[in-house]
Amino acid sequence: PPPPPVPPPPPPPQNNPTSQSSAASDVYKRQVMLGRTLEELGIVEQVVPEYISIKEAVLPFDRFPDVDTLLGPEMKSTGEVMGIDSHFGGAYAKAQLGAGMKLPTRGTVFISVKDSEKPAVLPVADQFHKINFSIMSTSGTSAFLSENGIPNKSVTKVSMGRPNVVDAIKNGKIQFIINTGTGDTSKRDGYHIRRSALKFNIPYATTISGAKAMCRGVTALRDKELNVKTIQAYHR
């Protein structure tokens, strides 16, 4: 029998160019590619820059109208961008701008999370309230936020009738979305929310960690203007 086909080589690691640009270390220069070791080059300690570099994937969901924007294990990105700043919030905001998403600095944030994540989303909701965002939530999340002293307005779920959260998105009443959930109904509602967010270019987070990062980015934009430097300036 003929020999089995040779599998294709793995794709090149995408973290290398980002690490090289952010760290400016000799570790990725030609000496290493020619076989020199890190010890031979005098690099025996970890390089820790005095700034933050954040890589963001560029996802072309706007080209595929029926594809859910919820991420899975398969690769969906078509490129990458990087934001650099002296603090996390500024770097994150720059990375989002590079990926084509402008974070809002005022307006209303919609929050709807599953029960197990309600305590974790509380600090995020509190921070948005402190920077003068209004908060809109579905019934369960709304009740939890109210019990913990965070003002909010309840809105109908997609599956419960109209006017609902998707109508609010279409009418320009929501500028930011935090939505997690489980179960068939939550998944169906979440799909319609995510597609509406994509259509109207509204930032959204499907995880608590993503919501925290975006909140820090928004806070940074409100506190001060983003400064711009060349990569060479950061590496001096």
Where are these regions (language model features)?
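Single conserved hydrophobic/aromatic residue that forms the stacking wall/gate
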Residues: 1-24, 28
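Extended, alpha-helix-rich binding/interface surfaces that flank or overlap catalytic cores
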Residues: 207
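Histidine/acidic-residue-rich catalytic or RNA/ligand-binding cores of hydrolases
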Residues: 218
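ATP-dependent carboxylate/acyl-activation modules
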Residues: 22-154, 158-183, 187-203, 211-214, ...
